Amino acid sequence: YWNPILDYAGRKAGVELLLKVARSGGESADAAARGDYDFIFSNHIFQPRVASAGYRVLLSTRDEPITGQIVTLADSPIRDLQQLAGHEVGFPSASAFVGYIVPIDELQRRRIDVKPVFGGNQEGIMAQLKAGKIVAAGVNGKLMQAYAAREGFRIRVLWESVAFDDLPVAVHPRVPAAVATAVRDALADMAGEIDGISVLRASAERIGQKPPYGFRRATQADYRRYADFYRATVLREFRASP
């Protein structure tokens, strides 16, 4: 998905953009906290322990906002969050924002103790839910809807969060401003260019992504809801300093 996009944008911006993928969400967050990446496509940058690295938002995808959900199978006897107390509930990973951090915050606010089970990624935990290995799961609502439709099963949404803007593209402060601007503009302009939209469409087809394609210019202010969440969360390990 990413390599053709980075190749196109890099040539437009006059820089080489190389893809680096961490083995897990946790490793990605750790690398971001160290400032390992010049550019990053992740919402980990809003976690308090990562925010100190100073990443600055440049772009947002044109996708619809994302929500966190707690779901169960449609034929499950569980119809209320309180019924999850004491049960194993699945999550993608401990670093997944709408898949874990937001749902577990809600459960703890309601003083509902569950036993977290991690599936490694979104589809991993969704597969466990489908197989009946867990009674419920914390998920990205948009991804859950697509997965359930593709796999042919129905879910019941027990709870859904407010909407958050989808993943941003951000830049580390060590990157020269001129380079950051060139990369931002190259990515933002792709959808309006004949060759650029062709690259975006071809990449999207590889993963079944639906339009609209590409990126729009954005700033930190567009993602203030993340900062608001981390200031108010009851999860001490994720709470931002006042």
Which residues does each predicted region cover?
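Extracytoplasmic small-molecule ligand-binding "clamshell" domains
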Residues: 1-45
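Short helices/loops that flank or line small-molecule/ion binding pockets
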Residues: 26-40, 52-53, 82, 123-138, ...
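Short loop/helix-cap segments at secondary-structure boundaries that form the rim of catalytic
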Residues: 32, 48-52, 147-150
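Pocket-lining segment of extracytoplasmic ligand-binding domains
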Residues: 76-77, 85-185
